[in-house]
C-alpha cells in the first residue's frame, strides 16, 4: 500500500480536531466521570488510564479510524503469520513465535521454508531447560567439579539490554520467593538470608571500554564463573573483543583448553566460529534471523541466562505473559487494544502537538533498567527518515525516550517536565512491593508512600496551579508579589498511567510485550520499517579506518594505507596520540 500518511482523510480530520483540543483544559476533562471511566482499559489484572491525555472520545475514535485507514490490523496479522515485513533485509519478524506454548504448536503453526518454526523454537527451549536445570542443580560442574556461582553475559545492544532489564526487575522477587517459604511480617522483612545455592550472580558486559571488563570481573573467581557470549554471527566487533578479553582472564587460572570450554557458552548461529573459539557444540544455543536483536529477550539470548538465574519454570511464566499480551495485540478490537491505544497516543502527541519526547517513569526501583531497554527498542525501531515507499519522510517519526524510576526522577528532571517543555509521561505502578515494610509510627507503608507520588505527579502535571492559587497561598507565606509567577504550573501536561497487581514473572512478560507491540504498531502508523537499523552501520564502517590507523601508528608499521580523515578528525586523533609520541617516536602519518 503506497501512501503519504499526511494526505489520508482521517489524518487531515485529526489536524482539525487536534486544533480544537488545544483550546481545552485537562482539568475539565478529568471532571467528566463518563470520559474518565471509558478511558480506563483493562487486561487481566492490569489497567491503563488514558484520561489525562488531551483528546476527547471523538478524537480518539478518529485516531482509531486512522489506524483502520492505514490497515494496521492487517499489517499486524501479516507480521504474526511470518510475512517478510522487514523488506530492506527480506526477513520475517517473529519474536512473538518464541512465546507460543508447546501445547499450541499445531494450532498456531507458522510455516517458513515448508517447516513449522515452532518445532525449532521448542527444540531450543527444551535444550535451555535441561542445560539451565543441570547448571542450577550442579549436574553440570566447573572444571574444579564444583557448582557455578557467577555468570557473565557478553553482548551489546539488543543482546543484553532487555535481558538486563528482566534480570534486575525479577532478581529480588526471586530471592523473596525463596524467603517467603517462611512467612514474615512487614516489620521483620529485613531478614535477607538467601539460600546462596539458589542464587546466581549475573553480570553483563557490553561496552568495549576496558573499564566495563574490569567492572564485570571485579571480585569474581574464574573457577566459579560461566561466560555466555551472545552474537548471532559471532563477528560483532565489540562483543568478540570483550569475549577474547574474558577468555584471557579465564585462562589466567584455567590453563587447559578442555577445562576452559566448560566455562564458555555461546548464543550464536555460526558454529564454525564458535568451534574455533573453543566452545563445545553442546554449549551453543541457536536463534534465527527472524529474531531482531532488540526483540530477542525471549529467544535464547535472554531465556538462557535468565533460566540459569531464576529457573526455567519461572521463565516459562514470563513467556506466557508475553504470549498473552501478544494474543491481545493480535485479536483485540482496536478501541480496546492496549498496545494499539498506547501507539496511537504517542502518534497523536508527536504529530498533532509536536511533543518530541516521552518520559518512562516506573514507580518501582527494580525496573531501573526498563527505560534503557525501551529507549533502544523504540528509537532503534522507529528512528527512521525514509518510509515504506522508499521516500524521504517530512513528518515526526520516533520520539526521544528516557526515564528513571520514581521518586528519584522527581528530584532530577521533573522540574523540566512540570515547568519547562511539555513531555508526555508514562507512569508505571504496582499494587504490591517486592519488599513490603510498614512500621507502627509511620502514617503509611513505604510502598504506599511511593504510590502517593505516582498519583500526585499525574494530577500535578494535568491540573497545575494557577496564579490566583499561588497568590492566595502567598497571603500566609509573604513571598514578594513579583516573584509569584515562578510558582505557577500551567498544567495541561499529558500522562498515561499503567497499574499492575505485582511485578512477577508473568506480569513482567506482559509489560515487555506491551511495549514491543506498541512500538511495532507505531511503526505501521508511521509507515516505516521498524525492524532494520541501518543507522548503526555507518559508524561501524568509519571505525574500521580509524582502527587500522591506530594499529599502524601504535605498532610503527610502514603502511601503504591512505587515511582520508577530515581536518577536525586529524586534529583530535593527534591529541589522543600525543602522549604516546612523547614516550616513543611514532609516525602518525597525518599530515
From Swiss-Prot:
Record's catalysed reaction(s): alpha-D-glucose 6-phosphate = beta-D-fructose 6-phosphate
* Superkingdom assignment: Eukaryota
Signal sequence interval, chain numbering? none
* Pathway(s) annotated for this protein in UniProt: Carbohydrate degradation; glycolysis; D-glyceraldehyde 3-phosphate and glycerone phosphate from D-glucose: step 2/4
Q: What cellular component GO annotations does this protein have?
A: cytosol
Its annotated compartments are:
Cytoplasm
The family database entries (InterPro entries) matched by this protein are listed as:
G6P_Isomerase, G6P_Isomerase_C, Phosphoglucose_isomerase_CS, SIS_dom_sf, SIS_PGI_1, SIS_PGI_2
The UniProt entry, under SUPFAM superfamilies, shows: SIS domain
Asked if the keyword Isomerase belongs to this entry, the reply reads yes
NCBIfam families the UniProt entry points to = PRK00179.1
Q: What is this protein called?
A: Glucose-6-phosphate isomerase
Upper lineage: Eukaryota, Sar, Alveolata, Apicomplexa, Aconoidasida
Q: Which gene encodes it?
A: GGI.R1
Amino acid at each position: 500500500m503506497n501512501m503519504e500518511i499526511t494526505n489520508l482523510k482521517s489524518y487531515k480530520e485529526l489536524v482539525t480536531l487536534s486544533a480544537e483540543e488545544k483550546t481545552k483544559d485537562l482539568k475539565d476533562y478529568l471532571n467528566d466521570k463518563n470520559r474518565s471511566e471509558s478511558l480506563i482499559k483493562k487486561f487481566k489484572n492490569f489497567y491503563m488510564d488514558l484520561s489525562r491525555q488531551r483528546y476527547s472520545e471523538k478524537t480518539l475514535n478518529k485516531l482509531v479510524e486512522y489506524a483502520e485507514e492505514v490497515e494496521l490490523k492487517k499489517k499486524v496479522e501479516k507480521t504474526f503469520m511470518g510475512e517478510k515485513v522487514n523488506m530492506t533485509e527480506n526477513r520475517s519478524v517473529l519474536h512473538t513465535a518464541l512465546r507460543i506454548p508447546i501445547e499450541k504448536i499445531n494450532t498456531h503453526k507458522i510455516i517458513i521454508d515448508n517447516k513449522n518454526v515452532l518445532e525449532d523454537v521448542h527444540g531450543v527451549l527444551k535444550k535451555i531447560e535441561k542445560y539451565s536445570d543441570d547448571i542450577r542443580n550442579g549436574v553440570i560442574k566447573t572444571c574444579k567439579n564444583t557448582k557455578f556461582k557467577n555468570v557473565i553475559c557478553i553482548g551489546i545492544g539488543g543482546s543484553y539490554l532487555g535481558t538486563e532489564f528482566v534480570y534486575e526487575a525479577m532478581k529480588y522477587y526471586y530471592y523473596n520467593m525463596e524467603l517467603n517459604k517462611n512467612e514474615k511480617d512487614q516489620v521483620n522483612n529485613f531478614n535477607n538470608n538467601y539460600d546462596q545455592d539458589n542464587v546466581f550472580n549475573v553480570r553483563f558486559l557490553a561496552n568495549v571500554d576496558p573499564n566495563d571488563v574490569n567492572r564485570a570481573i571485579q571480585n569474581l573467581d574464574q573457577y566459579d564463573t560461566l561466560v555466555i557470549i551472545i552474537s548471532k554471527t559471532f563477528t560483532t566487533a565489540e562483543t568478540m573483543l570483550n569475549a577474547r578479553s574474558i577468555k584471557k582472564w579465564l585462562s589466567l587460572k584455567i590453563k587447559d583448553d578442555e577445562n576452559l570450554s566448560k566455562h564458555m557458552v555461546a548464543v550464536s548461529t555460526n558454529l564454525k566460529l564458535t568451534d574455533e573459539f573453543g566452545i563445545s557444540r553442546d554449549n551453543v544455543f541457536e536463534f534465527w534471523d527472524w529474531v531482531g536483536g532488540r526483540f530477542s529477550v525471549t529467544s535464547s539470548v535472554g531465556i538462557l541466562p535468565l533460566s540459569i538465574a531464576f529457573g526455567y519454570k519461572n521463565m516459562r511464566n514470563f513467556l506466557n505473559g508475553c504470549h498473552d499480551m501478544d494474543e491481545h495485540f493480535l485479536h483485540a478490537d482496536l478501541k480496546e487494544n492496549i498496545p494499539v491505544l498506547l501507539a496511537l497516543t504517542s502518534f497523536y502527541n508527536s504529530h498533532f502537538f509536536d511533543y518530541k519526547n516521552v518520559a518512562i517513569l516506573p514507580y518501582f526501583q527494580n525496573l531501573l533498567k526498563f527505560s534503557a531497554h525501551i529507549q533502544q527498542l523504540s528509537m532503534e525501531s522507529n528512528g527512521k527518515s525514509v518510509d515504506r515507499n522508499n521516500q524521504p519522510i517530512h513528518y515526526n517519526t520516533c520520539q526521544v525516550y528516557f526515564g528513571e524510576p520514581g521518586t528519584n526522577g522527581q528530584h532530577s528532571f521533573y522540574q523540566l517536565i512540570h515547568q519547562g517543555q511539555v513531555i508526555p509521561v508514562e507512569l508505571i505502578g504496582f499494587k504490591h512491593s517486592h519488599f513490603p515494610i510498614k512500621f507502627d509510627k509511620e502514617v503509611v507503608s513505604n510502598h504506599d508512600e511511593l504510590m502517593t507520588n505516582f498519583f500526585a505527579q499525574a494530577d500535578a502535571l494535568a491540573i497545575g496551579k494557577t496564579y490566583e492559587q499561588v497568590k492566595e497561598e502567598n497571603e500566609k507565606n509573604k513571598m514578594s508579589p513579583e516573584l509569584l509567577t515562578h510558582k505557577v504550573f500551567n498544567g495541561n501536561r499529558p500522562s498515561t498511567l499503567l497499574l499492575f497487581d505485582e511485578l512477577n514473572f508473568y506480569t513482567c512478560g506482559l509489560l515487555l510485550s506491551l511495549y514491543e507491540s506498541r512500538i511495532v504498531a507505531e511503526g505501521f502508523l508511521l509507515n516505516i520499517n521498524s525492524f532494520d537499523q541501518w543507522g548503526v552501520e555507518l559508524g561501524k564502517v568509519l571505525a574500521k579506518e580509524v582502527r587500522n590507523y591506530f594499529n599502524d601508528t601504535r605498532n610503527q608499521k610502514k603502511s601503504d594505507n591512505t587515511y582520508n580523515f577530515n581536518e577536525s578528525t586529524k586534529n583530535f586523533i593527534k591529541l589522543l596520540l600525543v602522549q604516546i609520541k612523547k614516550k616513543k617516536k611514532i609516525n602518525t602519518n597525518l599530515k
